[in-house]
Regions:
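C-terminal domain-tail junction helix/linker
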Residues: 58, 67, 78, 91-148
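Active-site beta-loop-alpha junctions of metal-dependent nucleic acid enzymes
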Residues: 2-3, 19-43, 47
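Acidic/histidine-rich, metal-coordinating catalytic segments
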Residues: 25, 43-57, 75-77, 133-136
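Short, acidic, Ser/Thr-enriched surface-loop or helix-capping motifs
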Residues: 11-12
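Short amphipathic alpha-helical segments
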Residues: 60-62
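RNase H-like polynucleotidyl transferase catalytic core
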Residues: 47-52, 66-84, 100-106
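Mobile genetic element proteins and their domesticated derivatives, centered on retroelements
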Residues: 15, 34, 48-51, 64, ...
Length: 148
């Protein structure tokens, strides 16, 4: 098998999720994920909350500063403060990584499968917390209409 690191971003309001697979959990990987995330997210990012891992230092901190996005670093050993991301991690473990047919022998193949899973999550999978809407439906109905 291959070794990879999973990066994930989750919007507390709309439940919109983005994720990426990288070969290392380094600050440069986190910076790259941030750039990819900002290209995908259909609304303005007002702040970013991270768990304080070393991958969210150096290049990542500088990228947030350069973009004028406030960075909120959670205290150590407080996963309850990051409940939405922890829930997202569980969803990916149960609905994506646990399925053997999604596992691949290359990072590129894993990324392709992950992109499909994220699209399904954001576009087709209804969410109880959103009263049966998908994240994209919620964004269109409640975020983009307000901004227009």
């Amino acid at each position: 098998g291959i070794s990879f690191k999973h990066f994930q971003a989750w919007d507390r309001r709309s439940k919109f999720i983005a994720a990426g697979i990288y070969t290392h959990a380094k600050s440069l990987s986190a910076k790259r994920f941030l750039a990819e995330f900002l290209q995908k997210v259909p609304f303005k990012v007002l702040s970013i909350q991270v768990d304080g891992g070393s991958e969210f230092r150096a290049e990542f901190e500088q990228a947030c500063a350069d973009l004028a996005i406030p960075l909120i670093v959670l205290p150590p050993s407080k996963p309850t403060y990051n409940g939405g991301v922890e829930r997202g991690n569980r969803i990916f473990r149960e609905e994506f990584y646990a399925r053997s047919d999604f596992l691949a022998n290359s990072i590129g193949a894993m990324r392709a499968h992950l992109t499909k899973a994220i699209n399904k999550y954001n576009t087709y999978r209804p969410h109880y917390a959103l009263k049966g809407l998908t994240p994209m439906q919620y964004i269109q109905n409640h975020i983009l209409k307000v901004a227009a």
